[in-house]
């Protein structure tokens, strides 16, 4: 089965995690010695999804340097000091990813970033997520659910604190209404693991468009947004407190999102 490419939004300022993001972009903030973005990508790669299209913005140079250096840092290396010749030696378990790093501007909104990735994603189904959310979602089951209903968009939903946007979901998993801010704290919320068809780009006006507002609201109103309910682990690393909690889970050796070997 051909796997869809994975679009990842990684260009935001990360202001709620300023203790870390003053020095580095949020995607490179580390959990267990690896960037949070690495954890997100390992999750997708565990399901055979190895083609990544990453939207850059804030501190894009640091992001590019990280991926340029990644092969060298993952390899054993021989350096010949006489002439500076370098030879890399593969090690077992080395990453096998194709990563496209796309500059989507320093202040482009989430919808605008997605639209700027359109020409790099092709004319087929694609996955979409953010750089700071980790989960144990079965991505093949999510993809199968999306393909079963024939709509333009699938959003993964979870139960979580009331600071997240609320969705009114029908018995058939159709999203009847999408609200950026919740009206109460017991609804299903946007976990930002999407499966999308190219038709969603028509719902995005331009750089000032926030994906979580008009595009998702319009998709829901048109009956083109379906919800995949996830009842297991999901966390978003928005604050220093949440980073510390994820570090503790990783250090315990029982991180629920570590589904890879």
Residue ranges and their predicted role:
Residues 2-72, 101:
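N-terminal glycine-rich phosphate-binding loop and ensuing alpha1 helix
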Residues 12, 166-175:
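Acidic-glycine-rich active-site phosphate/pyrophosphate-binding loop
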Residues 28, 166-169, 216, 227:
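A structural signal for short hydrophobic beta-strand segments in well-ordered beta-sheet cores
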Residues 62-170:
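Conserved beta-loop-beta/alpha segment of the NTase-like Rossmann-fold superfamily
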Residues 122-129, 134, 138-147, 159-162, ...:
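Catalytic-core segments of class I nucleotidyltransferases/pyrophosphorylases
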């Amino acid at each position: 089965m051909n796997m869809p490419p994975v679009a990842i939004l990684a260009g935001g300022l990360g202001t709620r995690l300023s203790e870390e993001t003053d020095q580095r972009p949020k995607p490179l903030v580390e959990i267990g010695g690896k960037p949070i973005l690495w954890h997100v990508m390992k999750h997708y790669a565990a399901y055979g999804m190895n083609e990544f299209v990453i939207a850059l913005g804030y501190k894009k140079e640091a992001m590019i340097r990280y991926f340029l250096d990644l092969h060298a840092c993952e390899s054993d290396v021989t350096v010949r000091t006489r002439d500076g010749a370098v030879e890399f030696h593969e090690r077992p378990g080395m990453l096998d990813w194709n990563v496209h790093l796309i500059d989507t501007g320093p202040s482009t909104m989430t919808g605008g970033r997605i639209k700027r990735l359109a020409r790099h994603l092709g004319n087929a189904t694609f996955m979409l997520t953010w750089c700071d959310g980790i989960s144990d979602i079965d991505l093949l089951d999510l993809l199968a659910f999306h393909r079963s209903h024939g709509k333009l968009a699938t959003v993964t939903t979870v139960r979580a604190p009331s600071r997240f946007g609320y969705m009114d979901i029908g018995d058939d998993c159709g999203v009847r209404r999408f609200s950026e801010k919740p009206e109460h704290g017991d609804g299903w919320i946007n976990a930002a693991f999407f499966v999308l068809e190219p038709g969603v780009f028509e719902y995005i006006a331009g750089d000032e468009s926030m994906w979580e507002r008009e595009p998702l609201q319009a998709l829901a109103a048109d009956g083109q947004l379906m919800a995949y309910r996830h009842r297991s682990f999901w966390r978003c690393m928005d604050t220093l407190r949440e980073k510390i909690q994820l570090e503790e889970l990783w250090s315990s050796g029982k991180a629920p999102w570590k589904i890879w070997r």
